[in-house]
């Protein structure tokens, strides 16, 4: 089997984890106590769910996951919640004091007390696998645990499991709304430290998802549960090909092969469609062409940036449900004729397609409509550099005055790390810029480059 271990770090990671596992259980017909009712009619007789769940002798299905937070409150909610008996107590790891939105606490002081325990628990999960594919790491950029502890763990995972794929789902700080003043510091420090250890990082930003909930689902004041359920759908679409059988299945490493043209340029944009409320779905059936088109609308994206200002390097379309290759090819052909979608000239084809026959599942009583087909688009576009530029600018404003820096230095960080991280991100912005330049113009410079 090709197992995948999910690692959920910090409040954002753990709460997205809750939404994801709730959804996986529904999709595979696994009850909150881990039992799978004997009628196997739900998932067919295949056990492809074992990429994400391990089965115990007593017939319980346990997620291959660990939840880690440096303070206990968020994980305590799992320990007492509906899914408390789904997880083994050893999979829920908590510290005593939190990282206080401070990267340095998550990475150095508080983080290092819990890292060995965490690696030990991950090792136990890994030993339980026959052919581990890799890790999915869920975290936010802005929090102390999400930024600091994640980067520490990624470094250690690279050492222990060298060649295994590591994919991240990261909550990027939203442009307007902020949960912490020091988000730009944490984000840039963690991006710098994890850049060489992560193979592919799917970013979502809360503001973009708020807007989608407001616009498409008519939720006036979206809660984190609303946001996370939507993120859960995306994660589920991306991992569906690992958990179910389909016409064109996509493996973890296959994502990277098709989406990451250069090692550093590994931040695809995620877009999911259709996001419609149950009331609307009752009146409209969306065709393959329509949902595919919706993916190219900037307001359906999970990060605020405008792909019309950038160029696409690669696009991965993951369909699920009632979809046949013929419709997909027709939809893609139509999109290619539209001039608004620009590809870099060195990547002419650029579309990778996955089709999975398992229709999308929704959480009962949730806001999303049950639809016969859905698509998740992962696109590597130069437009995402806008998001970095925005963050770098915020970083510069604070760092010019050395605001808040003493909190980091006090936890054992050196001030040089800030400027080093900032330079690395400036280089990343430059990388994106160069990738978008047409190859005809820069033939003369090729020599200096390497």
From Swiss-Prot:
Undergoes a tyrosination/detyrosination cycle, the cyclic removal and re-addition of a C-terminal tyrosine residue by the enzymes tubulin tyrosine carboxypeptidase (TTCP) and tubulin tyrosine ligase (TTL), respectively. Acetylation of alpha chains at Lys-40 stabilizes microtubules and affects affinity and processivity of microtubule motors. This modification has a role in multiple cellular functions, ranging from cell motility, cell cycle progression or cell differentiation to intracellular trafficking and signaling. One of its GO terms (molecular function) is GTP binding. The lineage of its organism: Eukaryota, Metazoa, Ecdysozoa, Nematoda, Chromadorea. Belongs to the tubulin family. GO terms for cellular component: cytoplasm; microtubule. Its main location: cytoplasm. Tubulin is the major constituent of microtubules, a cylinder consisting of laterally associated linear protofilaments composed of alpha- and beta-tubulin heterodimers. Microtubules grow by the addition of GTP-tubulin dimers to the microtubule end, where a stabilizing cap forms. Below the cap, tubulin dimers are in GDP-bound state, owing to GTPase activity of alpha-tubulin. It catalyses: GTP + H2O = GDP + phosphate + H(+). PANTHER family: TUBULIN. The modification N6-acetyllysine is found at residue 40. Pfam families: Tubulin, Tubulin_C. The record marks 450 as: Involved in polymerization. Dimer of alpha and beta chains. A typical microtubule is a hollow water-filled tube with an outer diameter of 25 nm and an inner diameter of 15 nM. Alpha-beta heterodimers associate head-to-tail to form protofilaments running lengthwise along the microtubule wall with the beta-tubulin subunit facing the microtubule plus end conferring a structural polarity. Microtubules usually have 13 protofilaments but different protofilament numbers can be found in some organisms and specialized cells. Mg(2+) binds at residue 71. Its EC number is 3.6.5.-. This is Tubulin alpha chain. GTP binds at residues 11, 71, 140, 144-145, 179, 206, 228. The active site is at 254. Keywords: Acetylation, Cytoplasm, Cytoskeleton, GTP-binding, Hydrolase, Magnesium, Metal-binding, Microtubule, Nucleotide-binding.
């Amino acid at each position: 089997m090709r197992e995948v271990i999910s690692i959920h770090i910090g409040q954002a990671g753990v709460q997205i984890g809750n939404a994801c596992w709730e959804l996986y259980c529904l999709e595979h017909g696994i009850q909150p106590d881990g039992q799978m009712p004997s009628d196997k009619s739900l998932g067919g007789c295949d056990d492809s769910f074992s990429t994400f769940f391990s089965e115990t002798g007593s017939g319980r299905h346990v997620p291959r996951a660990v939840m880690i937070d440096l303070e206990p409150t968020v994980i305590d909610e799992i320990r007492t919640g509906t899914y408390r008996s789904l997880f083994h107590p050893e999979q829920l790891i908590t510290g005593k004091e939190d990282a206080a939105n401070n990267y340095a606490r998550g990475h150095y002081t508080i983080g290092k007390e819990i890292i060995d325990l965490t690696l030990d628990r991950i090792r136990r999960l890994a030993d339980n696998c026959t052919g581990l594919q890799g890790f999915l790491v869920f975290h936010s950029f802005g929090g102390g645990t999400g930024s600091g502890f994640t980067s520490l763990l990624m470094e250690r995972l690279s050492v222990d499991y060298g060649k295994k794929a590591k994919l991240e789902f990261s909550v990027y700080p939203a442009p307007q709304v902020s949960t912490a003043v020091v988000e730009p510091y944490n984000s840039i420090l963690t991006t710098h430290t994890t850049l060489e250890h992560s193979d592919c990082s799917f970013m979502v930003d809360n503001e973009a998802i708020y807007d989608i909930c407001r616009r498409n689902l008519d939720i006036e004041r979206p809660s984190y549960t609303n946001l996370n359920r939507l993120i859960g759908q995306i994660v589920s679409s991306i991992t569906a090909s690992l958990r179910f059988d389909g016409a064109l299945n996509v493996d973890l490493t296959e994502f990277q092969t098709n989406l990451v043209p250069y090692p550093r340029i590994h931040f695809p944009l995620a877009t999911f469609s259709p996001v419609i409320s149950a009331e609307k779905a009752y009146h409209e059936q969306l065709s393959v062409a329509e949902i595919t088109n919706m993916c190219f609308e900037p307001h359906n994206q999970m990060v605020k940036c405008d792909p019309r200002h950038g160029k696409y390097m690669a696009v991965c379309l993951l369909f699920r449900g009632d979809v046949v290759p013929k419709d997909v090819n027709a939809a893609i052909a139509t999109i290619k004729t539209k001039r608004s979608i620009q590809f870099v000239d060195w990547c002419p084809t650029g579309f990778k397609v996955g089709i999975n026959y398992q229709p999308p599942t929704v959480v009962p009583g949730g806001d999303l409509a049950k639809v016969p087909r859905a698509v998740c688009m992962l696109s590597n576009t130069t437009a995402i550099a806008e998001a970095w530029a925005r963050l770098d600018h915020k970083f510069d404003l604070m760092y010019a005055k050395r605001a808040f820096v003493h909190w980091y230095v006090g936890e054992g960080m050196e001030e040089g790390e800030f400027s080093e991280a900032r330079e690395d991100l400036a280089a990343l912005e430059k990388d994106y810029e160069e990738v978008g330049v047409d190859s005809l113009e820069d033939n003369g410079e090729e020599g200096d480059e390497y």
